[in-house]
Amino acid sequence: MSDTPLRIAVTGVTGRMGKEIVTCIVKEEKQFSQEIVLGAAITRLNTNICGMDAGILINTDALGIEITDNLESIKDNFDVLVDFTAPDISIEYLKFCVNNNKNIVIGTTGFNQIHKNIILNASHKIGIVFSSNFSIGVALISKLLHKITQVIGNTSDISIIETHHNRKRDIPSGTSLTMQNIIVNALRSIHSNRIIDSNLDSTTYSPASSYKDILIHSIRAGDVVGEHTVLFAGPGERLEITHKASDRLIFAHGALRAAFWVGRDKIGLFDISDILEMDTLL
């Protein structure tokens, strides 16, 4: 391991997650043994704050790092880029990282299949941690879902209920789609009844396969950070698995843990389960 702290570039610093990640790096560096530091603060939508010290943005002392919208000007100032923005913008940042041999953590959701193919191709050249949710709790639930579905999936009606704040753009949430795909793959392995869902890519899921109907119910209300419940309803009983996020700090911690894990040298496509080494669980 290098003795030099890992320098993190954060995009979308005026957004909810961008600001949270900057705050986490600066104010909670002890959690990471001071092995990561803020290297760059990037914006695209709020160019009027370019030149402002990033410390002012999070109400702390000046950090000596100016917010910028010019990637070329800061390409030598960071090792890993952490991105929670929007799909098209994320792809631009990804291409920049590929061209400059920088690893990237992507927490953006709402990607289409073309975007996902670009991410996959880029992972042959750089290290990418790509996850719809960087909460450890959600990662554990995702691991449990596969096992539970294998046991009771073919005798249950399965639904996913997700609730987020009223400014969240993508419906359904990326996390709920990830959960749905985990359940679908588990059902495929036990040859269950047919699944009908317009969100699923017909090129990925064969019409000849048989699945159960899995519905996603989305709620957008107030300032809810994020809640996900998976319901397995069977004869005489039901099982509900719920995760409730009350603070975006958990996502910031997870993303920075991912950045530290992928570091400067790893190449490939990874997700939160790789970082937590969850293949050894259950």
From Swiss-Prot:
Source species: Blochmanniella pennsylvanica (strain BPEN)
GO cellular component: cytosol
Sorted UniProt keywords: Amino-acid biosynthesis, Cytoplasm, Diaminopimelate biosynthesis, Lysine biosynthesis, NAD, NADP, Oxidoreductase
Disulfide bond residue pairs: none
Binding site for NAD(+): 12-17, 107-109, 131-134
Active site: residue positions: 164, 168
Principal location: cytoplasm
Ligand binding ((S)-2,3,4,5-tetrahydrodipicolinate): 165, 174-175
Listed GO biological process terms: diaminopimelate biosynthetic process; lysine biosynthetic process via diaminopimelate
Known pathway: Amino-acid biosynthesis; L-lysine biosynthesis via DAP pathway; (S)-tetrahydrodipicolinate from L-aspartate: step 4/4
Role this protein plays: Catalyzes the conversion of 4-hydroxy-tetrahydrodipicolinate (HTPA) to tetrahydrodipicolinate.
Name of the protein described by the UniProt record: 4-hydroxy-tetrahydrodipicolinate reductase
